[in-house]
A protein has these predicted regions:
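Cationic, low-complexity basic patches in intrinsically disordered or flexible, solvent-exposed regions
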Residues: 3, 17-18, 23, 261
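ATP-binding N-terminal substructure of ATP-dependent carboxylate-amine bond-forming enzymes
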Residues: 28-130
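Short acidic-hydrophobic, aromatic-tinged amphipathic segments that line or gate anion-handling sites
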Residues: 78-84, 156-160, 191
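A conserved helix-loop-beta module that forms one wall/lid of the active-site cleft
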Residues: 125-187
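Internal nucleotide-binding/catalytic subdomain
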Residues: 187, 191-329
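Active-site "cap" helix and flanking loop/linker of ATP-utilizing ligase/carboxylase catalytic domains
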Residues: 280-303, 320-391
Length: 392
């Protein structure tokens, strides 16, 4: 397939905001043209993305870097390129004449994979590195939320562990202690006692349990309520809500144990019915898009607000800049329509609300994890007789 392409000049509306280099061709697709896709990642989310993308009649080939047994089972071609190897990913996309790149995890996005692909003239469904800091830095996200007037927990940011500990003693428990940077969903401690909060500061900032992610720390007020995940597809100026979802992060039954990247999810979340989606987007998504656009970086891709539904209304706990895992799995099971076309519409700045629809059925995803997760756990184990389990 040879897609049509045009060279855009600076100063042409939306594309000027995207800061496309003068010489980079912008590729767009007409209805009926087939595309070659590269999905980045190796988890259940990427398996779900491949499953959904391959339902499009426009897809000729799907590559996954590095992929897993599930993506191979869907007929995708797994390629041994790590999700964090930006040079390798760009080289792969060029070699295989990829028409659409779909990053799954946060690491390539915060590392600038969209910027790199854009420089190579390859459409990429995801935000640039500046916008991806919404997820990559909790302090940055708090700053944007405050500028945009988005409701969120009161917080303080620290780079000195002694000052952070003094604040813990002064504020008292319960508190939420967060590593500023990426920690695979495991850098948040809900401290029920002052000692737990002090230990969390020590682990994150002094012992560097999460490496460089703990160089800066965010201490937040403890919010009471029920959590929900609210995702919108965005084209830089338009945000279209997806159905709500709810994931459960505690490692053990009964919401007990340490936080994980997610042990399961379902959609919809009863706490956030779809008839409230537009109002929620107006409150927590569209103001962020406007703030980032004012910064000169329109947000393209999935913007995910992790919400706490409190007695005083919804408050944002965090933003992710990609599909959640495991929320992606039940969400994509409910999503109707051509996801390939929807992603291209987002990249091209012409997303239409009517292009998204979903089934009214409920979807559920459950995570099977190795013993010991999210702490040290064995890896490389073979999964037998359980990769596809039916629920009655």
């Amino acid at each position: 397939m040879q897609p049509r392409s045009v060279s855009l000049r600076r100063g042409t509306g939306f594309f000027q905001q995207l800061r496309l280099p003068e010489s980079v061709p912008y590729v767009y697709f007409q209805g009926g043209e087939v595309v070659r896709i590269l999905v980045i990642g190796s988890g259940g989310r990427e398996h779900a993305l491949v499953w959904k993308l391959k339902q499009s009649p426009r897809v000729s080939e799907v590559f996954v870097a590095p992929g897993n047994g599930g993506t191979a089972r869907e007929g995708a071609i797994n390629v041994a390129v790590d999700a964090g190897d930006l040079d390798g990913l760009v080289e792969l996309a060029r070699k295989e004449k990829i028409d659409l790149v779909v990053p799954g995890p946060e690491l390539p996005l915060t590392g600038g994979i969209t910027d790199r692909m854009r420089e190579a003239g390859i459409p990429c469904f995801g935000p640039d590195a500046y916008c991806a800091r919404l997820e990559g830095s909790k302090a940055f996200a708090k700053d944007v939320m405050n500028r945009a007037g988005v409701p969120t927990a009161r917080s303080q940011v620290f780079t000195d562990p002694d000052k952070a500990k003094n604040a813990v003693v002064k504020l008292g428990a319960p508190l939420v202690v967060k590593a500023d940077g990426l920690a695979a969903g495991k850098g948040v401690v809900v401290a029920r006692t002052t000692q737990e909060a002090l230990d969390a500061v020590d682990d994150i900032m002094c012992k560097r349990a999460h490496g460089a992610a703990g160089a800066k720390l965010v201490i937040e007020e403890f919010l009471v309520g029920e959590e929900a995940s609210f995702l919108c597809l965005c084209d830089g100026k338009t945000a279209v809500p997806l159905p709500s979802a709810q994931d459960h992060k505690a490692a053990y039954d009964g919401d007990q144990g340490p936080n994980t990247g997610g042990m399961g999810a379902y959609s919809p979340a009863p706490i956030l019915p779809y008839d409230q989606a537009e109002a929620m987007a107006d409150m927590v998504i569209r103001p962020i898009l406007a703030a980032l656009a004012r910064d000169g970086h329109p947000f393209v891709g999935v913007l995910y607000a992790g919400l706490m539904m409190t007695g005083n209304g919804p408050k944002v706990l965090e933003y992710n800049t990609r599909f959640g895992d495991p929320e992606c799995q039940p969400l994509l099971m409910r999503l109707e329509g051509d996801l390939v076309q929807i992603m291209l519409d987002c990249i091209e700045g012409r997303l239409r609300p009517e292009s998204l629809s979903h089934t009214s059925q409920t979807a559920l995803g459950v995570v099977v994890a190795a013993e010991g997760y999210p702490h040290a756990y064995p890896k490389g184990m073979v999964i037998e007789n359980g990769a596809y389990v039916g629920l009655d």
